[in-house]
Structures are given as structure tokens and as C-alpha cells.
């Protein structure tokens, strides 16, 4: 399973660790992902999505039905 938020599309990005001496070593910044079940009132069922913390805030703001409609138009499975 890839580390990608289904709502926002956030994915890992590359960067550097910096020591006290400012030596650079490569690292990955991972999104804050959680598998979360959301109740969809229109369908009378739970839907499990892999979302970031920001994605949960988007769902709280827009509503799960609107977000699922966006996922359907993008052709994503959920």
C-alpha cells in the first residue's frame, strides 16, 4: 500500500537531515497517514480511507459525501 493520502494526494517528499555540523544526509518526510472509517449516511455504510490529518480536516469541512464524489470523478477506488 502506497503512502499517499486519498483525499489530498500528499505523498512522501525527499529532503536532508542536518547535523550540528550541517552535514546533509538524505531522508524522506512521510505524510501523517491514518486508515479511518467514515460513516456515509447516503449509502448507509462505512467507507475506509487512508487519509492524512489534513485530509481529515478537509472531510470535516466539505463533508464525506462531497469528498467521495471528488474521488469518483478522479476514478479512485475506496
Curated annotation (Swiss-Prot):
Methyltransferase found in the keyword field: no
A Pfam family that the UniProt record links to this protein: Ribosomal_L28
Single GO term (MF): structural constituent of ribosome
Entry keywords, A to Z: Ribonucleoprotein, Ribosomal protein
Gene Ontology biological process terms, A to Z: translation
A single Gene Ontology CC term: cytosolic large ribosomal subunit
Top-rank taxon: Bacteria
Family that this chain belongs to: Belongs to the bacterial ribosomal protein bL28 family.
Protein name as annotated: Large ribosomal subunit protein bL28
Amino acid at each position: 500500500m502506497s503512502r499517499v493520502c486519498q483525499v489530498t494526494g500528499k505523498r512522501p517528499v525527499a529532503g536532508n537531515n542536518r547535523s550540528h555540523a550541517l552535514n546533509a544526509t538524505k531522508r524522506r518526510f512521510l505524510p501523517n497517514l491514518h486508515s479511518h472509517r467514515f460513516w456515509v449516511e447516503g449509502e448507509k455504510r462505512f467507507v475506509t480511507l487512508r487519509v492524512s490529518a489534513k485530509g481529515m480536516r478537509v472531510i470535516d469541512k466539505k463533508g464525506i459525501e462531497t469528498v467521495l464524489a471528488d474521488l469518483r470523478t478522479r476514478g479512485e477506488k475506496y
